[in-house]
Amino acid sequence: MTNTEIFDKLRDAIVNQDVAGTPELCKEALALGIPALDIITKGLSVGMKIVGDKFEAAEIFLPQIMMSGKAMSNAMEVLTPELEKNKKEGDEAGLAITFVAEGDIHDIGHRLVTTMLGANGFQIFDLGVDVLNETVVEEAAKHKGEKVLLVGSALMTTSMLGQKDLMDRLKEQKLRDSVKCMFGGAPVSDKWIEEIGADATAENAAEAAKVALEVMK
């Protein structure tokens, strides 16, 4: 089986909510010498992007999202130890405060991005899901003067709108200049990031790690 065929199978396993088969495919891919990062970026993340697009278009609903998320979680149990082995040593890239927006409990992409940031040298403080903007601002204030990156996720357009409110609150509390702000999720676009005055977004978790490192330079 070629690498491309493996990646296609991984993609389809996520889209088809194959909870048991996805981690087994990951083991097969690792045994073939495919790096964990490639398994995520070229296979699993492609599947999650399709799932996110289908959800946004109301082609699938929460039960399907949850099952695809379970398949992804099972895959990450196999892959995270491999990512840890290759974790970059040296100075911490900074503190990444990660969270899912208020009103949103979809944490699949959030968990994946958090894992990838940790594997790339960030210290992680994970606030979890359905997080109030007030809570994010409070945490940012506690770490004023440090290298801080706020990483917010929203799968739904309604919860994405709260990102603008967060940016406004950071400005009001005079914290905006002391943190970098990065947002992701199916409805988030470059245009939206520019509109609300944030620093960056990314297409997938692996790209998020690269963009985050660039933003924090």
UniProtKB/Swiss-Prot annotation:
Subunit structure: Can form a complex with MtmB.
Family matches, as CDD domains: corrinoid_protein_B12-BD (cd02070)
Claim: Repeat is one of the keywords in the record: yes
Name of the protein: Monomethylamine corrinoid protein 2
Keyword Metal-binding: yes
Family affiliation: Belongs to the methylamine corrinoid protein family.
Residues bound to methylcob(III)alamin: 106
GO cellular component terms, semicolon-separated: cytosol
Role of this protein: Acts as a methyl group carrier between MtmB and MtbA.
Metabolic or biological pathway: One-carbon metabolism; methanogenesis from methylamine
Occurrences of domain B12-binding (ranges): 93-217
Domain B12-binding N-terminal: 1-91
GO BP of this protein: homocysteine metabolic process; methanogenesis; tetrahydrofolate metabolic process
Matches recorded under Gene3D superfamilies: Cobalamin-binding domain (3.40.50.280), Methionine synthase domain (1.10.1240.10)
Short name of one Pfam family: B12-binding_2
Top-level taxon in the UniProt lineage: Archaea
This protein's UniProt keywords: Cobalt, Metal-binding, Methanogenesis, Repeat
Organism: Methanosarcina barkeri
GO molecular function (one): cobalamin binding
